[in-house]
Amino acid sequence: MSWPADQAPGLTVAEGAAIGGDVRFGANVTVHAGTVIGDGCTIGDNAVLGKRPTLSSRSRADRQEPGPLTLGAGCAISAGAVLAAGSTLGPGCVVGDLATVRERCSIGEQVVIGRGVCVENDTTIGSFTKIQSNAYITAHCLLEEHVFIAPCVVTTNDNFMGRTEGRHARIKGAVIRRGARVGGGATLLPGIEIGEEAFVGAGAVVTRDVAPRALVVGSPARVLRQVPDEELLG
């Protein structure tokens, strides 16, 4: 093991977990079986790594064994965060206090997931994306590289809100393309696509796809202007 026992009181590491070199643990961390933690990671107090999903009898979610949680080198997982089995985080990711990453998520390198963020199952997040505090990323979303999600953004994936059996085939989260930015408190309806380098203003309710470089505001969101050249990624 790569830590002095007296510096990680209450640490529980299940058989079959793989811990890299120079890993630092806080108090009362739980590492479930099969979890892989890369070199140089820091795990905060009361974090839970590799948790298996608990599904209701009525859930249609995938019930297959999700596989291990894998953390790339240099990840920082903060206090009280819960990361499920079957997800992968690339090198240098930061997960804030009390954040949740559900099963079968694929997260690139140097992604920031802020305090209290919930990333639901089967979501993909590209490298260098930032998701700020208390945002909700629903299941089956795609966020490409260099996306910025401001605090308290809500994404949705079910237009039928739990009614009709046919809804299961039509569940789809948002697609947010490279370099797009979504302002605080905005709401994205199911299946919405936010184009590359687009900008969604704070509090907007997005009911239609947003074209690349469009700046939209309001409820329902409407185009105000184009994103200026000086704000574009290189």
Where are these regions (language model features)?
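Structural signal for interior beta-strand "rungs" in well-ordered beta-sheet cores
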Residues: 2-217, 222-223
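A glycine/serine/threonine-rich, flexible loop-to-helix segment
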Residues: 213, 227-234
